[in-house]
Structures are given as C-alpha cells and as structure tokens.
Amino acid sequence: MFERIISFAIQQRWLVLLAVFGMAGLGIFSYNRLPIDAVPDITNVQVQVNTSAPGYSPLETEQRVTYPIEVVMAGLPGLEQTRSLSRYGLSQVTVIFKDGTDVYFARQLVNQRIQEAKDNLPEGVVPAMGPISTGLGEIYLWTVEAEEGARKADGTAYTPTDLREIQDWVVRPQLRNVPGVTEINTIGGFNKQYLVAPSLERLASYGLTLTDVVNALNKNNDNVGAGYIERRGEQYLVRAPGQVASEDDIRNIIVGTAQGQPIRIRDIGDVEIGKELRTGAATENGKEVVLGTVFMLIGENSRAVSKAVDEKVASINRTMPEGVKIVTVYDRTRLVDKAIATVKKNLLEGAVLVIVILFLFLGNIRAALITATIIPLAMLFTFTGMVNYKISANLMSLGALDFGIIIDGAVVIVENCVRRLAHAQEHHGRPLTRSERFHEVFAAAKEARRPLIFGQLIIMIVYLPIFALTGVEGKMFHPMAFTVVLALLGAMILSVTFVPAAVALFIGERVAEKENRLMLWAKRRYEPLLEKSLANTAVVLTFAAVSIVLCVAIAARLGSEFIPNLNEGDIAIQALRIPGTSLSQSVEMQKTIETTLKAKFPEIERVFARTGTAEIASDPMPPNISDGYIMLKPEKDWPEPKKTHAELLSAIQEEAGKIPGNNYEFSQPIQLRFNELISGVRSDVAVKIFGDDNNVLSETAKKVSAVLQGIPGAQEVKVEQTTGLPMLTVKIDREKAARYGLNMSDVQDAVATGVGGRDSGTFFQGDRRFDIVVRLPEAVRGEVEALRRLPIPLPKGVDARTTFIPLSEVATLEMAPGPNQISRENGKRRIVISANVRGRDIGSFVPEAEAAIQSQVKIPAGYWMTWGGTFEQLQSATTRLQVVVPVALLLVFVLLFAMFNNIKDGLLVFTGIPFALTGGILALWIRGIPMSITAAVGFIALCGVAVLNGLVMLSFIRSLREEGHSLDSAVRVGALTRLRPVLMTALVASLGFVPMAIATGTGAEVQRPLATVVIGGILSSTALTLLVLPVLYRLAHRKDEDAEDTREPVTQTHQPDQGRQPA
C-alpha cells in the first residue's frame, strides 16, 4: 500500500503539493480558532446544591436540610460521590458524577431529585443549583471603587451601599450578557434595604406587635388590576395602584388606631436606608471594596471569555458616574499569555536547534529545508485535530511536542534519497535524467518505508498507556498524548507523500553527498571507541549492567509527586481566625494584613480578599476566614530582580506570621482550586477521618495533627474547624409558655423578627428593587439584656387589647460554643487534617506520615482514616501505569518481531529501553527533580526514541549481512555508516527539548521533568546504540557466523558510505 502511495506522490507531485497547501490553509484557519489556556480544566462533572437556611445551626442544617438532600441524590445514574458542608444558615451538597456524563443531563437529574426533597425540607427553605461552571471557572475579578473626593449628585460621598448598588444594577446585568459568562458573583458593600426599625416601648404603649408592623407593610404596598370597562366604544383598563414610591410613603402607612386616631409607622419607629445582615465582605489594600467575580460557562475558553469581559468592562467604565471606576484585580488572561509565551518560546527555540542540526548533518540546503518544512506542516495538521476534538493549546497539551521526534521519519527518508541520488550520479558519471531521478527517489523511499512506519508506530504505541489514565490525571495528560500522536501521524503521512514529491521536484540534477567537518570529527572519535568496545566485550557489558543496577537504586531514592506545581506568579493566602470571630472583626484583621504586606513588600502590586460567604455560595466560608490573593508585579519591576519567588513567599510568610490572631495557608490561585477539586480540600495532602460523633472526630483529628506537625516537610498543618462557634440560645420553657397561653412559635416568631428581621415587601425604583425589612434597632439587637426584655405579645383578652410579657418570663438566654461546621462525604461525617508539603516530595512524605500516625494514634473502633489530595492521584496514576506500560512494551516487542521476523534481533533493539531509562533517571537525580507523572510521560516518550535508534542501526547491519559481509565487517561498517542518522536522530530529539529543560518562564516547571528525562535518556540510549548494541549483536550472532560456510572476506578498504544504503 505504501509503495503505491509513494509512487502516486512522485507521479502526481504537483497535486500532492497542492493538497499539502490546502491542508496548511485549513491548519492556519484552525490555529486562529484554537482555544488557548494555561492548563487543562480537570474539573470533574459536578453539580452544587446550595440552600440558605437562615437561623439554623450547623447541626440543625445537617439534620433538616443537608441529610434529606443527600438521601434523595443516592442512586442517581453515574453518581460517583457526594460531599456536603453544613454551616450556620447554609447547606452545600456537591454531587459528583462519573467522567463523560453530560453536565446538563446531570443537572436535570439533580433538579428532579431536588423537587422530591422539597417536601422533606422546612418551610421557606428552597435549594438552588450552583452556576453551570467549573472549579476553575473564576477567571476574572474586579472591584467597584470610588476615587478620593468623589461625590454623588446630592453632594454626599459614595458609601459601600452605593457602590454595591452600582455593581448589582449597572455592572452585573451587562457582564452577564457577555458570551461564555454563566454567572456574576458579588461580595462586599451592603445590599440596599429600606429598614423599618420599631421602638419596643412605642409598640408596647400602643398595644402593637412586630407582626402588626409586618402585616401593615404587606397590605399597603401592592398594585391591583381590576380588569377593564367599556365606555363610549373605548376600553379602559382598571387598576388600583398602592405601591410605595418613597420613604415618606412607608412612614405614612397605618399600623393601627388608638382612641380613633391612626397610628402610622412614623409614630412607632424610624424608616431609613439600612444595611443587610451580610454574610461576606471584600477588602483591597486595607480598605473595604465591592468585589465581583465572573464565572465562566463550562466548556468555554478562559482566554476568549476573559478578553470579552475585559472589553465589556472598559465599555462600562466609560458610562460610570464621575469618580467611580471598575478596577480589574485578577485576569486569567495574564497567566494564560505568560504560560503560552513559555510554550511558544520553547517550541520556537527547539525548532531552530533542530533545523540547525539538519543543515549541519545533511550537508544539502534543499534537503534540510524539505525536512524542516515537516515541522510547521505537522503542527498545522495537529492544530486542525485539536480544534475538531476541542482540545485547548496549553502547557500540558503542547508540553511533550518535540520537533526532533516528529521529523525522525522524514530525516530517514530524505537522507536515504540524498545518498541514493548522489551514488547513482557517481555511478553514471553524469547528472541524472528526470526519470532516473524519480526512480531513485522512489527506490530510496521504498527502502526506508519499513523502518519509518515501524519506528513511528512504535513511538505512537508507547503513548497508549497515557490514554489509560482516568479521572483527574486522565484529563491532564490525555491532551498531551493526543497532540503528540496526532503530530506523529501527520509527520508520517507527510513523510510518504510530501517528502518524496518535494525531493523529486526540488533536489536538482546535481547532487553531491559530502561529509562536513562535524561528521568527520565524530567519525574519527567514534571509530577507535567502537574498536575498543568490540575488543573488550566483557568490560562493556559489565559496565552497562552495573549502570542499570545503580540507576535502579537511584530511582528508588528520587521521591515522587503527582505533577510539579505551576508557578502562577501570584500567591493565594487564606487567613483563619478562631471560630466565632465576627465579620466586622475579621475585616479589620484582614485590613491589617493587607496594609502590612503592601507596605513591607514593594514586589506586591495589590492584596485583596473575600471574607465570609458571597452572594452565590459556590465557595462558602464562615466569617472568621478570609480568602486572599497577593498579586505580584512583573519580576523585572522588583527592586531585587534576582530574588526568587520562593524567597519572596518565605519572607511574606514570616512577616504575616508576626500579625497576631491569624493562622495562614499559602498556595496559588489555580493550585488551590486544583487541590480542592481533587478531594474537597485545598492543601497538598489531607488526612480524612470518618465516623459518627463530632467530638470523637475532633479529638482524634487533634492527635493526628500533632503527629503531622512533627514530620519533616509538613507546613501549615491545620484541623478543620468543626467546633467553637459561639451561640446565644433562647431556651424556651414549654411549661411557662403554656401557662401564658403561648405556643412555641409565638415566642420564636417574635425573636426571629426582632433580631433577624423579616422581609415585608419590595420597594421598586425603576428596574431596581430593594427589600423592605422590619428589624429592631442595632442598639437593642446587640444587647443581651435588651433581648431579655423583648416584649412577647400574649393572646388578646376580652377587651381585645394586646398585653405583653418580657422574653425572660418564658425563656432563658444561654451562651455556649456549638458546632462550627459539619462535613460529610458519601453520607458519612468526616473531619479533615490538611497540610502543605514543602522542601520534599509528597511520595515519600505520605508513607512516613502514615507510619507515624499508625504507631502513635489509635483510631477508635467504627472510625477510619483515608488520605486525600494530590497523593491520591499519584497513587491512582501509578497503579494504572504499572499495568498498562508493560502491555505497551509488549506491543513494541511484537512490532519489532514483525519488523525483523526474528526474536533475537527484536530483543537486541529492545535493550535500548533500559539503557534509555538509566540516562533519564540519572538526569533527574543530578537536577534534584522527583519522579512525577510528567517525568513518567518523558520516560514513555523515551522508549520510542530509544527503540527507533536501535532499529535504524540493526536494520542496516542485517542488510549488510544479507549482502555477504562477515559478521565483524557488517558490525563495523554498519555502525560507522549509521553514525550520521543515529547522531541526527539523537541530537534533533534531545536538542528539541533543551529549551524546555532550561526554561524559567511561567509554566516551565511543569515541562522541566519531561524534558530532563528525554535529554538524559537519549544521551544514554545513543551511547548504547553506538557502543553496546554492536557488541551485543556480534555476541548474539557469533554462533550463526561459526555455523555458516566460509565466505569471501570483505576487504578492509570498503568505504562505509558507498554501496546500497537502506535506512
């Protein structure tokens, strides 16, 4: 089949070139549509169910809201896991589905079960699904700020409430219409409310209750339609408006009467524009701000959506009131652009190095150009496939592309064509005719097709194990394997179509094969080394075996991690205070952190944070926790440009540690989300303890935490804050309440309305709407003694008058700590001890920590412990690769057997793999890089290249034997003749990765292990191919030589570069 393809390509060369140009045009079109990102989105298919349950304690929230929702979710098709969190007034259930489940189908299933659960939930508690986004969907954050001295139209300064109103009613509606945006979340400032604050004394003097005020507001704030009437042939719509239009309208609402006189709201309390009882706040550089967040629709491209949002923000800014502006504080595009710049730089530099090697070794400019053309053409082919399969260009998908490996097949064919054309011209003693030239090109391509096809297939097959990865690791590495295989496939197709056609067209009548100085130098050095190797077989093989054994020992000491942490250039800082810290106190403490860090470190551009829970509780936090971002300036603007990111982080940690009242957890914006998506925790590793009793869980967790803190490398060890939330409990005495004729709900309603407030209608202002809330004045709400005097209305007597008793008559007020939060996983309560690992690898940290915990902590009966975090993914990927990699290597051997039809020669080529691995292991050890899945991908790529080198040399030695050369002659001539292609293959493959190995840009740390492994492995593999493989071949075939009939000896004057030279 391939012979016909090659023949067609040469005969129809212009048609082939036209088709290649068409493919290139499609590739350019695809490149312009190619989604670009920093890393693949590894979010599992999950649906969040958020439920607001005002006034419910964590325990009540778990019992009455979380548990019923969890129960109905059980048994959903494709359900993989449920996680839940119950906090004061909030329940969040995360339903996780198996990979491949359509997210919209998953949401439909969850919504159906929510409808079932509603009957079992308390009245007024309504679950809602979270936005259709991913865990990495927070791509753009901004603040709405007023400049110093900015004034509103009435001359007053802008308040946090005013800024929140602008955010909610001007900015948010416009940004929600940007394509790719699924939701806008807001935190900070205050939701505007019209607050009715009755005086308890005035209410009691008029015999009125808080419920009377609520009812009066509800009955005097509505518009009613009354159909229509017809009059003199015209139709009139009848309506009776009664909606309040101003604060005065609210003040004039009648609540009741006293001695025939109306009692209005203004008579019993104040009406003012008030503030909500907020659950979250935002700060930036030490001052309160309003912070907005864009949630990207799942499946969209973060760079494209961020740019569209940024353009819309610029448009909105031009329409903002004077002195008010939107300031972008986080834009994912910045990270994406820096990461892609690193990838582009590495690929471009790698391509240049590869092309230089081609020019140096081929010695023919046109031949080198034809070979080099495969690089952009294969890339354009790859881009087309990536667009069709919706794979974004990112650090992972483009991180394993090596142009040297991609063009290996083309190098083999072009070199063979040049050699045959030169030899044919020398044989005829004249320039070749066109038909003779085409014949030689066909013969050369035909000779090379077998090692080319088998070599490329072998490299593709070694990538198959990566496709066996599942879950998070699968989502990270599948794109990488896909793009490499696609590029190799494109290069292979081009090698048997474009390359023969281009050689036939552009390599002219006069072809001279001449060796450059570099090759002559290499041969002069190689020939004596080869002779010494052949003369000292035992020494060479012993050295090779010892090298393998030593590297196996080194490999056991390398350590391991899932993937290297991407240096995002910014820092995430989470500040934790003791449970019960109020929101206002947390905000003040956070301001101190921000002002201190901003003043101490000129490298910091800004510090901003979210404290508590935002409007959409996608990431619920209690008021004692602040989730902060430290945005750094570009390194060129640092006062000390040589200062490393790690040194700056260490200095920031030290300075922050001096501020009292806070514990910290440091991470990076994407890394933090990455860890959280993996196992529901934000740290590198986590110990999860499961059981029933919260107190037992808490006590056990403290013991485990103490052990973890003693393990070298453990930092920021903390136990999930499950207890210690201060609670003021109104304990109602049923007997006393019954004596006064009161129901429990009568007392509860009075407390709930007075302290928590009650919505009593809506105030409309154009298309804006604000709640009207009845709540006691802050002076009363904040005083325990005042609450004890809260009037509780008694049932009306015969005179229809309302009488009151103080709350203290039927209830006591008790202050005691209660549960802070309750976490559950797969229907069971759990507590998490989290830790970040620095200065060592996770792979060695976890076994040491596990052994220490087992020896020092006794887990109670009925309770159990598991590990979470990135270690979980490392174990999963390692287990799967241990099964699949041997299968792939077996397939490689089967291909080698098919190539040679000889088990012995197949095994000889196969020995290239362990020698390649030794070089990769040694390179990692020298550079101090632990083993990771990224490094494992490098070893996988290495296996293909190592086998390809051996294939090139052994196939030629076999051909010489078939021509009648003696064993020693075939080995020597074959090794010297194939020195050039072996060195070219090794150099282009390794040099293509050199920029990746030494790069320092954003994302370089992710690619570095892979590149290091390939470079080190190719060096050792090349040494094997050039020195050990000839020794092994002669040793393996010595008996065959002895058994053969005596041949005519081949003279030593044979020149290795003459005669038939198949690839």
Curated annotation (Swiss-Prot):
CC terms in the record's Gene Ontology section: plasma membrane
Protein name: Cation efflux system protein CzcA
GO terms classed as biological process: response to cadmium ion
Residues covered by region (Disordered): 1040-1063
Annotated Polar residues bias: 1049-1063
Pfam family, one: ACR_tran
Gene3D superfamilies attached to this UniProt entry: Multidrug efflux transporter AcrB pore domain (3.30.70.1440), Multidrug efflux transporter AcrB pore domain like (3.30.70.1320), Multidrug efflux transporter AcrB TolC docking domain, DN and DC subdomains (3.30.2090.10), Multidrug efflux transporter AcrB transmembrane domain (1.20.1640.10)
General function of this protein: Has a low cation transport activity for cobalt, it is essential for the expression of cobalt, zinc, and cadmium resistance. CzcA and CzcB together would act in zinc efflux nearly as effectively as the complete CZC efflux system (CzcABC).
Domain of life: Bacteria
Bilayer topology: Multi-pass membrane protein
Location relative to the cell: Cell membrane
Principal subcellular localisation of the protein: membrane
Molecular function as annotated in GO: monoatomic cation transmembrane transporter activity; xenobiotic transmembrane transporter activity
The organism of origin for this protein: Alcaligenes sp. (strain CT14)
Keywords carried by this UniProt record: Cadmium resistance, Cell membrane, Cobalt, Membrane, Plasmid, Transmembrane, Transmembrane helix, Transport, Zinc
Family (UniProt): Belongs to the resistance-nodulation-cell division (RND) (TC 2.A.6) family.
Transmembrane spans: 14-29, 350-370, 452-472, 487-507, 534-554, 883-903, 906-926, 937-957, 982-1004, 1013-1033
